[in-house]
A protein has these predicted regions:
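Glycine-centered, small-residue-biased loops immediately flanking beta-strands
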Residues: 54
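Glycine-rich phosphate-binding loops that contact phosphosugars or nucleotide phosphates
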Residues: 57, 61-194, 203-205
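Internal, active-site/partner-interface "lid" segment
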Residues: 201-235
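Conserved small/polar residues in nucleotide/adenosyl-binding loops
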Residues: 240-249
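A short, well-structured juxtamembrane/interface segment
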Residues: 34-48
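Short, basic, glycine/proline-bearing loop/turn elements
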Residues: 24-34, 100, 125-128
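Cofactor-/ligand-binding subdomain signature composed of acidic, glycine-rich
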Residues: 1-31
């Protein structure tokens, strides 16, 4: 059912449009909150698999795939883990990160082929990301993974979708209709990013990559991170700033 503001958006002022978008965005956090039990179950299962030596794969198309890649790419510098621990895969390959590869998401076989390149095994976990829950690339791959005994989860904004039905641990976030009809890069994308933050952050905490709330395993690869490492050392072992600088050669 159309909302009161759905008509004639093009006639509204900039102030009105951004106020309406912001109003809709406020519902996203509450929608995520309603699914915390499902998110908890998924994270605990991923943690168990990682402690067996498993990896985490995010699989998606379009915006969903890009969000998975974004979250995965932040894990090595933030938590000091191998770039092969959390891996984002997008339909159409790396070229789809910058330029849409619209028909890539329709393949029923490419997703499994993409995972096989990483020698996927039963210790790994795969999360399918699809706002609609109908993307063939994702649905078919998650179904295949489950049949192989691989832990499967999904993030979708469409209840009782085909994706939810074929995965082991579905997380369904109902965010209400998008501000622009069908533009799932908006609230659906925001909800997805929030949950990916929860998944990667909580998993890294539970496998020992965080002390208190500090990134104790971050990789010192630039001046900003060097200075951050100095501050972490100061906080955790009460070094003076000067004493911490003396350890630079060992960082």
């Amino acid at each position: 059912m159309p909302r009161s503001y759905d008509n004639d958006l093009e006639k509204k002022s900039v102030a009105d449009i951004i106020e309406l978008i912001n109003s809709e965005d406020k519902f996203v956090a509450y929608a995520v909150e309603e699914k915390l039990d499902d998110i908890k179950r998924l994270i605990e299962s991923i943690e168990n698999q990682m402690k067996k030596g498993g990896r985490l794969f995010y699989l998606g198309a379009g915006t969903s795939g890009r969000l998975g890649i974004l979250d995965a790419s932040e894990c090595p510098p933030t938590f000091g883990v191998s770039e092969n621990l959390v891996i984002g895969i997008i339909a159409g390959g790396d070229k789809a990160i910058r330029k849409s590869q619209e028909f890539a998401e329709d393949s029923l076989t490419q997703g499994w082929y993409d995972l096989k390149k990483f020698n996927i095994n039963k210790n790994d976990s795969v999360i399918g990301i699809a706002a609609s829950g109908t993307t063939p690339y994702v649905v078919s791959t998650i179904k295949k993974c489950k049949s192989k005994g691989i832990l499967t989860g999904c993030l979708t904004c469409n209840p009782n979708s085909p994706l939810s039905k074929v995965c082991e641990i579905p997380v369904e976030i109902v965010v209400r209709p998008e501000f622009i009809t069908g533009s799932t890069r908006m609230k659906s994308g925001t909800a997805t990013k929030m949950i990916l933050n929860m998944i990667s952050t909580t998993t890294m905490v539970k496998i020992g990559k965080v002390y208190d709330n500090l990134m104790i395993d971050l990789k010192v690869v630039n001046k900003k991170l060097f200075n951050r490492a100095i501050r972490i050392i100061n906080i955790t072992v009460s070094y003076t700033h000067l004493r911490a600088h003396e350890t630079k050669a060992n960082l």
